[in-house]
Amino acid sequence: IAVTTVLKPDADSLRRAREKAEDLRITFYEREKNLFHMSEKYGKEGFLIYGKEPVFFWSKEGTYRFHLGTAVLRIFEMRKGHGDRLCNLLPGDCTSVLDCTFGQRRDSVILSWYLRKRGEVISLERSRPLYEVGKEGLAALSGQDGEMTEALRRIQLLHADFRGFLETAAPNSFDVIYFDPMFRYPVKRKENSMEGFRSAAVYDPLTEDVLQFAMRAARKKVIVKERPFSALFRTGLFTEIHGKRGQTTAYGVIKL
């Protein structure tokens, strides 16, 4: 990837873009009118684009910006007293969650809002574009109210891959360790607005040995969100599978 700016950037946007390119040791290009032509001209798969708004990622497949998406609706439902499928699986005394797959950020936001100040959420993201977009989004975006904004700010986002992180994590480091690798098998829809995200994602496999690392680093539970037919759920490690007929996702739980 490379770094560029929006069309007609102000001085601050130009400065930020140049500094980020230098920091990441990747190339900065002066913005040209057509990003498709820039991609072909310079042989780049995508660009981190800086402007007055938080950085976003562009690729030929689409554009990815940080936004809260369905997290807002899920929190709205919880405020009305309805349960959330993921949060319902957390132990009642949970004070720390490691989200190994930050990705589209929704679950990290939900978990941080649910735990509030009594707990912490640390999230991992290996993809450099998704990490940069996520880091700025968490710091800059404001929610509909103070609680939502505080939930965003409390998330600690690290640029790391989950295998390497878990291999070196101390035993019993987190109450819960969570994985959501399901975007490898997207739910089929007539329109898919997530191609920009998918083009930036890193598709690290969630394997049985990674789950063993997670079981060592977790104190109470390991939770995996996957498609119901996932081979992971047939490894014999999971003590519970939560899913209903007609749902496109299921949660596997390893109780420790």
Enumerate the predicted regions with their spans:
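Hydrophobic beta-strand segment of the Class I
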Residues: 97, 177-178
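Residues at the starts of beta-strands that form the adenosine-phosphate
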Residues: 96, 120, 154, 220-221
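Mobile active-site "lid"/loop adjacent to the S-adenosyl-L-methionine
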Residues: 181-210, 230
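Conserved SAM-binding loop of SAM-dependent methyltransferases across substrates and taxa
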Residues: 104-118
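S-adenosyl-L-methionine
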Residues: 1-96, 109, 124-176
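Conserved class I S-adenosyl-L-methionine
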Residues: 94-103, 122
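Conserved Class I SAM-dependent methyltransferase catalytic core
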Residues: 207-254
